[in-house]
A protein has these predicted regions:
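Active-site-adjacent helix/loop segment of glycosyltransferases
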Residues: 60, 69-139
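A short, conserved alpha-helix in the catalytic core of glycosyltransferases
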Residues: 24-26, 30-35, 40-67
Length: 166
């Protein structure tokens, strides 16, 4: 268990304000004081809010003994679409994400997963991890650069088509 604050940014980067709504609890008074979640975002409202908390001098606590069961079983294309939206959210909120790249965290996760599969003698699963990770990264990179894409391409890439109905 730990509490992360602004002081941790140089050491942990984007992991300083990693947050997932499915596993989060918020102090109501602070949530209201800071205006809650951003009103319009394609994805990542939890991390945007957590980044705002850090910027305003608050901390984010992680409770190691908390129990949450949550999972996804996304296909490669679903991973692409989801991570496209993640990239869009980071591109649209540089006030939170500029200066804290997340690519390094993804690479660490891939390496850790591959090492785990090797240790467990499940080497046949490694190509799937690489394929899934490639789809995630391609989606993320496309999302970060969505402003350079034609609208038709954006609508094909996104998981949240309704977001683009302006």
């Amino acid at each position: 268990s730990y509490v992360r604050t602004q002081r941790d940014l140089s050491l942990y980067g984007i992991k300083t304000f990693f947050c997932s709504n499915v596993c989060a609890a918020y102090k109501k008074e602070i949530y209201q004081e800071l205006g809650g979640f951003v009103r319009k975002t394609i994805f990542n409202e939890d991390m945007i809010y957590a980044g705002k908390l850090i910027q305003m001098g608050y901390g984010i606590a992680y409770a190691a003994d908390a129990k949450v069961i949550h999972s996804h079983n996304y296909s490669c294309m679903q991973q692409f679409h989801r991570n496209f939206d993640l990239g869009v959210s980071q591109a649209e909120h540089p006030e939170i994400f500029a200066g804290v790249p997340s690519e390094g965290e993804g690479i660490k996760l891939v390496k850790k997963t591959i090492n785990y599969l090797i240790q467990k003698r499940k080497i046949w699963m490694i190509p799937g991890v690489i394929l899934q990770s490639g789809c995630k990264y391609a989606g993320y990179l496309s999302g970060k650069n969505y402003r350079k894409l034609p609208r038709k391409m954006i609508l094909w890439c996104t998981m949240n088509r309704e977001y683009w109905n302006v």
